[in-house]
């Protein structure tokens, strides 16, 4: 038997906590036998004293084990259970293509996703732009969809990592969110509860990233890879660029439209293609569905070219109560904004920088995201035809097409877009889509 205050004191004095002490504390968070003040105190001591790798692994596994851990063995699936997690960005619609692509290659992807947070778009919000799409199927239905289709994208239920929910709520109001061991534990507790064989992390870098600097993004990626592998799940991470909107669109319905066009081959943004393929390659190799990069890319290109990936996406939408002909008739089903028109720069030049975070917040301000949990989303608003870094901008080339609910909203968004995109008389040096691969 442990005392919460003694565990806090031990960490306060700079000592490492044992696995048993960490489990006692996390179970107390779940059971409400640990007070909010005690949670806040431990969070602050971890913020200042950090955690050793064994402590980080123990924290993550204790939070994972505070609720249901999915077990797929009874289904006798003939492929690996794999998933991807992104730290979030703007125009980051990779999940909608990646899940079906990997499933079409023989993987099983039980993706538990989130809503938009701050300036970043949420996969669940995007999917809810599809009429009827059910993000909360019951456990049996979730398992059936994984078995039959190979991929399902759902919301987090209260039974998965419940201790994390209470821990995070306290961190949010005590200035302890930005602690790498606590971020790592929070992300991985939910992902590892999916019962995965392998995981790939997409850690964003740049003006639209969760972490403010490249060095902190790198440190987070290394921590996640170390902890997840320590917890027994094969994990790699990619550091990917978020110095500009990843897709050609940002919003909800507009990104779903682009995802379908990507899968069918109607239109593929080159940077979005690079990042999506790179993440899928990691999933196939970690899941032992391909022996190397070349084999993985060939398999993935094949399922795009022969229509299997698009077919899997369509089957997933239908299985989750969306329209059965969604892929064929997406324009019929997706909402469109009342006003769609281009915004042009006031001067000419090359795009040298982009405040991606500000562009994400502009989508939120138009109604495409939530400022508080009770807000309703306007799924139709957002940006399309986004200009890229290095593009030559003049009176013919707009910065973006803005989809807004009315003229006032359009004007506010246009002002935000102009302020967020910097022009110069010289084109900037090109930056990679993927900066680094982390395996340990």
UniProtKB/Swiss-Prot annotation:
Enzyme's top EC category: transferase
Catalytic activity: thymidine + phosphate = 2-deoxy-alpha-D-ribose 1-phosphate + thymine
Molecular function as annotated in GO: 1,4-alpha-oligoglucan phosphorylase activity; thymidine phosphorylase activity
Example GO biological process: pyrimidine nucleobase metabolic process
Keyword Glycosyltransferase carried by entry: yes
InterPro entries (alphabetical): Glycosyl_Trfase_fam3, Glycosyl_Trfase_fam3_N_dom, Glycosyl_Trfase_fam3_N_dom_sf, Nuc_phospho_transferase, PYNP-like_C_sf, PYNP_C, Pyrmidine_PPas_bac/euk, Pyrmidine_PPase_CS
Enzyme Commission number(s) from the entry: 2.4.2.4
Pfam family, one: Glycos_trans_3N
Superkingdom, natural source: Bacteria
Keyword Transferase: yes
UniProt GO cellular component terms: cytosol
Family the entry assigns: Belongs to the thymidine/pyrimidine-nucleoside phosphorylase family.
NCBIfam families to which the protein is assigned, alphabetical: PRK05820.1, T_phosphoryl, Y_phosphoryl
Annotated PANTHER family: THYMIDINE PHOSPHORYLASE
Assembly and interaction partners: Homodimer.
Entry function: The enzymes which catalyze the reversible phosphorolysis of pyrimidine nucleosides are involved in the degradation of these compounds and in their utilization as carbon and energy sources, or in the rescue of pyrimidine bases for nucleotide synthesis.
UniProt protein name: Thymidine phosphorylase
Source organism: Salmonella agona (strain SL483)
Gene: deoA
